[in-house]
Amino acid sequence: MGFPRILSKNNKIYTKLGEFCLSGDSFWIVCHTCQEELQTQDQFWKHIQDEHNFLHGVAKEHSRTSSYCLTDVEAAAAATTPGATASSQGAGSVTAVTVPLALYHCSAKYSDDEQREVELHEAHQQQQQQQQQQLHQQQQQQQRDAAKELAELHANAVAAAAAVAAASDGSARSSSGIDIKVEPATLALPPDMQAAAAAAAAANATIYHLPQLVPAPAPPPTASFVSASGGSTSTTVSTTPPSHQPIMQQQQHQQQQQQQQQTSTTLAMSVNQSTAIAAAALLTGPDLPKDSNSTTASAGSAVSSDDGERWYICDYESCGLKFKYKSRMELHRVVHSKERRFNCDLCSASFKQSCNLSTHRKKKHAMRGIKSELLPQRF
């Protein structure tokens, strides 16, 4: 099991902590500290760890009740093997170990001062535990009291709400013309319950702020509804006055319509002003030059040759180049203008022709693409 053992002459194995006893088929281990017999090595190892605080060959703390000391072991060895000492003396330098080895030397007794300190420490720990238990019990009691108070307040609020509802029902019945006397429910309640009911009623009360409305004149009675059945005619005239709620709704609707009309008129006025300013700016603007930067060919630039083919001539100053297609001439006129329609999507460079843009992309950005990908900028 990881600890040293020595074989003696009487077929017993002695260790620092226990004695392995073999007798026929039976096997047990006797602990040197407490003389307890154990059946297996695992039980013995667990016993010395749990009972005697022995871990990995080192004893951390010596037990007070232990009587296992080096002097006791030597006395027991001298009593059991009296011839061992003589044989060892006759052999000279050779010594035979036949007694169990003591793990450590134990002190004779604990001093009274140490025992008192230990007792005081234990008493202090017990006192702290008792104080903690008392505090815990007090906290639990406070929580229970708070829960009870909340339950009582809830019950009082429910009772007050029921009383207010009953009082409102009674007032409604009395206003309807039925003479029913309802005694307030707060008469049978104690003073504290009455105060809680009054507070709940004040909290539940709702104040409605109604706008001051000018009373409208009474409308004329509605037209009579005539229903003819056969030869008899019955006329029913309804003289029920309209309620105040439809009047309020109509007035609110009229106010909303007026506000919408005002906002629409202000918007229309602002739009008219802006359009008038823009038109005046266009009318008073400078005259455009004759040689504009437009890329479209005029109708007079198309000329027919002697062989019947139609040519498009550039009419920019003294250029005079001829093109077979109108689109080619439009692309050519960009050269004369300052317009740069082809912009690089990777930098801020712009060019007049797509071929220049493709060359720029190949040289500067190492990009190759077809001409259809180079789209001019649209204004």
Swiss-Prot record:
Principal place of residence: nucleus
Organism: Drosophila willistoni
MF GO annotations: DNA-binding transcription factor activity; RNA polymerase II cis-regulatory region sequence-specific DNA binding; zinc ion binding
Signal sequence region: none
Matches recorded under InterPro entries: Dev/Hematopoietic_TF, Znf_C2H2_sf, Znf_C2H2_type
Function recorded in the entry: May be a transcription factor for genes having (A+T) stretches in their promoter and/or enhancer regions. Binds to AT rich DNA.
Record's keyword annotation contains Nucleus: yes
Bilayer-crossing regions: none
Protein's GO biological process: regulation of transcription by RNA polymerase II
Bias kind Basic and acidic residues: ranges: 114-124
GO cellular component terms listed in the entry, alphabetical order: nucleus
Compartment annotation: Nucleus
Keywords assigned by UniProt, alphabetized: DNA-binding, Metal-binding, Nucleus, Repeat, Transcription, Transcription regulation, Zinc, Zinc-finger
Compositionally biased spans, kind Low complexity: 125-143, 223-242, 249-262
Protein's recorded name: AT-rich binding protein
Record gene name: ATbp
